[in-house]
Amino acid sequence: MFVVGGESLIDLVPVSSEPGAERLALPGGSPYNCAIALAKLGNETGFLCPISTDGYGDLLLGPLAEAGVALLLGERVAAPTTRAIVSFNEKMQASYVFERGAERAFTREGLLAALPERVATLQLGGFVPIEPEDAAAWLAVAEKAVAGGATLTFDINVRPLLVGDEAAYRRQLSRLLDLAHLIKLSDEDHDWLEPGRSIEEHAAALLARPNCELVVVTLGEKGSRAFSRHASASAAIYSPPVFGDTVGAGDSLMAGILTWLAETGALAPARLGALDRAALERTLRFGAVVAGLNCAHKGCKPPRRAEVDAVLAG
């Protein structure tokens, strides 16, 4: 079973580029998107995040149920749903301003109790390392999962506007990365975390951490790269026939990569680090198709497995 932990929220997305344009309320949040994408690709998936009792919380539940994602924290919370106010640049790449709420309404004990006994892979990321108390709770979850034999995967997904104490954030992130077997980051994450350092140097530093065996870096329209302990590879993006926007593209790519690795028996310690160039290329290609099909829509709408297979077969 995949367990995905982290935030869910509502993206308030403008319907046009005009100032003051009406905004659509769309379910989102990086871990939320990844959980749905994993389930739609055919994986048994549980989501570890509180959901509000408000109307936006109802809106979040619909796609989870449709995809078949199990809610691991069953009781909903009174805190309002976290909101992300979305803006787009000329390339339709998204940026966000956040108002946090229900996704933080948890306790360490509650998260640990909700973690299933048998977890094959725990996927964390997004807001998880930002607040010290939250980060400590998620670290305990990660430690429990890894001690039980789970593979830990982590999508860094830095949100600089939410980072009040950069030194504390870096410490909290570092503790989680020390446990992770697979680490994903974007070129924007790289530039914020390691300005002036090459991606190759950054990947090597991550691979030198105690558990890390695979690093994936997304490069926007330039595609993606992967680095194992023995090889590296790159892949181009997949461009859908009709383009919507890039919301959830990285989350969809992550779900695709995890799905491919799990299906090929590589999503496990010692196996990730042994991936050669050809295996990395196939992994990135699968992830790119999942991400590209998501980008055919407005907002995050990851594809079903049959859609991905149809593209790969063509």
Predicted regions span which residues?
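Glycine-rich phosphate/adenosyl-contacting loop at the front of the ribokinase-like
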Residues: 1-69
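Active-site metal-binding loops of divalent metal-dependent hydrolases
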Residues: 6-8, 127, 156, 252
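Short, glycine/acidic-enriched loop or turn micro-motifs at the edges of active sites
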Residues: 10, 14, 53, 158, ...
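Conserved N-terminal subdomain of the carbohydrate kinase-like
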Residues: 44-126, 311-314
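Short gly/ser/thr-rich secondary-structure transition/capping motifs
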Residues: 100-109, 162-168, 272-273
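Conserved beta-alpha-beta core of the PfkB/ribokinase-like small-molecule kinase fold
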Residues: 121, 127-205, 212-213, 222-223
